[in-house]
């Protein structure tokens, strides 16, 4: 079997100007980045606002193994299959972060015969969105330090600056640093640190903004620090929201590319789902809905993280809620949740599938709480056996959830046809009646307890001393009506990554809250979730190279 990059490089790409015509986009509506990439103009996005939105399909997954369960691959294959059925379909996906590409994950543009192209460009610098977000974030850091140096009129306490610098790489050495050393002309010495770019609040803001005006307002609402008397300092106090918006004026435009089968794809934004809200941009999803009859989108990691945040945080900013939710499951992950060691996952084990099914069952029940129809997609792997597949299908039938085997990695659109037909049938037969899990009027404490008990299956929430103080402070600042974005391990329903399956009778501890007032949510920190990842012992970068003719090598 060819590698992902070999498959991608064997495809004869169509000019993006031809691809976008399939959904009514003309050459004048796009800004080209070479022959195969483009950005969509503000004028076109404005022109389609009055269009009736099409059907929205959200792809999510069970709690993943470290390798992931193939949500992006399944999303791409499902969109290709829908187009093959004659349904005008678009993709709306996140763009990869360079850090994980160079680290543990390799490429992140789908896999096998379900990929978005040109995958090398998408995985590396793409159209420069990540660089623009990094620059805007670090410009703000520089402006904060300059304010301290130039007299500090706002009375910012250097010990209480919460805005960090960012880099789109995995670099553990930069998690905690000291800046301003050397001499008085080098600034005010203080503790600082770096996050990965996709953890920046500016990434979340870009993905939730509805236009340039909204982007500017959200940037102005960012809290960067506290004064000596513990009052919040906003970007608007520094009067630099205009400059930050200027840096991001092109990055806010969604990117257009294509799949192997020529399906138009909007790929834009990429916040992580374990430390942010894990969804692509509102602009990309909204525009796809108004251009196509079916839009396929995804939310990061398992349904307890990405899908919960999609439904509670992103949907209120969209023209509509999902018409169906597809939960991707793999037999290897179910066996891992059933107690099988990673080294033994290739061996047939139907009993482990039965035990691990508890994880999938809880995700199905959770998504049904939102009153949206659910379909299970089994992402087929070579090691899967007929007995294991039959076991999983029978278990799905017991809880009356439609289930289909999909082999889009190996067979592309054809491998997703059964799933696509089932999804269309479910949408036609069962109307969604979206219901949000909590109200904005609930307190932050109530929202957290709701998520932990209703989605995670936990018994109770313990708030650490700092979190308890912040609950009171944030209410005084007027932030208590914002949604909650939980920062939690992706591997478990709990805050313990080794607690697999569907655990019950556990507590989750919130050690502190982080205000993301520009994005419009409050992050609740649990466990030891890192906002700047490190590299593994053998980084994926070690297998990468470039040929003399410029062709990328070893990129997954």
From Swiss-Prot:
Pfam families: FTHFS (PF01268). ATP binds at residues 65-72. Keywords: ATP-binding, Ligase, Nucleotide-binding, One-carbon metabolism. The keyword Ligase applies. SUPFAM superfamilies: P-loop containing nucleoside triphosphate hydrolases. The keyword Ligase applies. GO terms for biological process: tetrahydrofolate interconversion. Gene3D superfamilies: Domain 2, N(10)-formyltetrahydrofolate synthetase (3.30.1510.10), Formyltetrahydrofolate synthetase, domain 3 (3.10.410.10), P-loop containing nucleotide triphosphate hydrolases (3.40.50.300). Its EC number is 6.3.4.3. Pathway: One-carbon metabolism; tetrahydrofolate interconversion. One of its GO terms (molecular function) is ATP binding. It catalyses: (6S)-5,6,7,8-tetrahydrofolate + formate + ATP = (6R)-10-formyltetrahydrofolate + ADP + phosphate. InterPro entries: Formate_THF_ligase, Formate_THF_ligase_CS, P-loop_NTPase. Belongs to the formate--tetrahydrofolate ligase family. HAMAP family: FTHFS (MF_01543). This is Formate--tetrahydrofolate ligase 1. It comes from Streptococcus pyogenes serotype M2 (strain MGAS10270).
